[in-house]
Design a protein with these regions (language model features):
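Beta-strand-centric surfaces of beta-sandwich/beta-rich domains
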Residues: 1-398
Length: 398
């Protein structure tokens, strides 16, 4: 019988002294499950900075939030319900901290609606939305809230999940790649990670009629206040905990370049990209809801027909093929075994399910352009984008 190599898992049982940090990391990574960190009361249009900084005493994989509350709509139905209501009640989330190598950074600055949609871009199951005890369908095409489901006169007990992954999202078979993006205690200055939430109001859900009233109370109650439950998920890495070269993922959601969607045209530059290692570029298009409170920004509709032949460009050359957005959109969906929701368009560079293939935007020369160009098909469109970037050298990739 031939001599077969001992599987890595069996070698670890006997001790990890002879293994490299990469071998250990590939074998030892067990998540501890969501651990309660903080409970934040909801107040309309408030933007609280959580009084406690995130406890980073173990490698951290994700932050999970749940908005739990009752919304009572009375007087009159909403005349228009926003496409992504009610997850628009959390307007924005900012995560910032001081990294020992990259100094003060903001890894997350995204709208609540985009955070809600994010997992669905990369896996079959997205964030959970439960209305009056009924799990809602996954985001699909189109994305449009039905007023009879939410927006008409009625009482709605809402449980809305917002999972914020700290690593790029890979398929289950490639989950160990997440280890190279965990927030390691030794990489950050003390307990400097700070979370800020930005809350909406009744205009976050759409356009209320003149007689519409909206009351926010505790989940399952006509009194009290809604709450945001915030949990953290840590990983146990064993001997690998202090040996991994961890990268930091940056996701900042921005509006398209001013005026770029105001006129119909071909090959229009709609956004400049940062010259950083890039794992994904996600676009979101539709129309903006008018008449909201000053600090509230909401998509009235999500629409795939605002842009066409969208390209990631370096020096006038596309870095990924795309002749029709519907083909590019469904290619990304096939690669991640999901349905890309209406209005969203993802250009992945890690459909290989490994960070080894991220686009080396950091190697684009100083005088070169790194941008998003597109044909613009309508003069009334609105859009945002997220360039998912990587700082550092995960896996010692250089």
């Amino acid at each position: 019988m031939p001599n077969l190599p001992t599987p890595p898992a069996q070698r670890v049982v006997g001790g990890s002294q002879g293994l490299t940090s990469r071998q250990v990391a590939q074998v030892l990574s067990r998540y501890q499950g969501p651990e309660q960190f903080f409970q934040q009361p909801f107040t309309i249009l408030d933007s609280p900075v959580l009084p406690n900084n995130i406890n980073l005493n173990r490698p951290m994989e994700s932050i999970e939030m749940w908005w739990l509350g009752r919304v009572t709509i009375a007087g009159a139905n909403y005349t228009t319900v926003a496409a992504e209501a009610p997850q628009t009640i959390i307007q924005k989330v900012i995560l910032q901290g001081t990294h020992k190598k990259f100094n003060q950074i903001i890894p997350v600055n995204m709208t609540g609606a985009t955070i809600f949609a994010w997992p669905r871009l990369f896996q079959e199951r997205g964030n959970a939305m439960i209305i009056n005890g009924v799990m809602q369908n996954e985001l699909s095409v189109p994305v449009a809230q039905v007023p009879a489901n939410f927006g008409n006169i009625g009482t709605y007990d809402l449980a809305i999940q917002y999972m914020i992954p700290l690593a790029p999202m890979f398929g289950p078979a490639a989950r160990r790649s997440v280890n190279y993006f965990l927030y390691q205690p030794q990489d950050w200055v003390g307990q400097s990670l700070q979370l800020q939430l930005f809350f909406g109001d009744k205009s976050s859900f759409g356009t209320p009629a003149g007689g519409t009233t909206v009351a926010f109370t505790a989940f399952g109650s006509n009194s009290g206040s809604p709450q945001v439950m915030i949990d953290t998920n840590y990983a146990i890495l064993g001997a690998a905990a202090n040996k991994i070269s961890a990268g930091v993922v940056i996701r900042n959601e921005q509006s398209f370049q001013g005026g770029s969607l105001s006129s119909i045209g071909n090959s229009i530059r709609i956004a400049q990209l940062q010259k950083q290692k890039t794992t994904n570029v996600v676009l979101k298009t539709g129309t903006q809801l008018a008449g909201t409170s000053p600090s509230v920004i909401v998509f009235q509709t999500l629409d795939d027909s605002v842009l066409e032949r969208t390209q990631i460009i370096v020096d006038n050359k596309p870095v990924k093929n795309n002749n029709l957005n519907i083909i590019a959109k469904n290619y990304a969906g096939r690669q991640f075994n999901t349905v890309i929701p209406g209005g969203y368009l993802n250009f992945p560079f890690v459909e290989s399910q490994t960070p080894l293939t991220y686009f080396r935007g950091d190697q684009v020369s100083g005088g070169s352009n790194f941008e998003i160009d597109s044909d613009v098909l309508t003069e009334t469109g609105f859009g945002t984008f997220v360039q998912e970037q990587v700082l550092g050298n995960p896996m010692g990739l250089g």
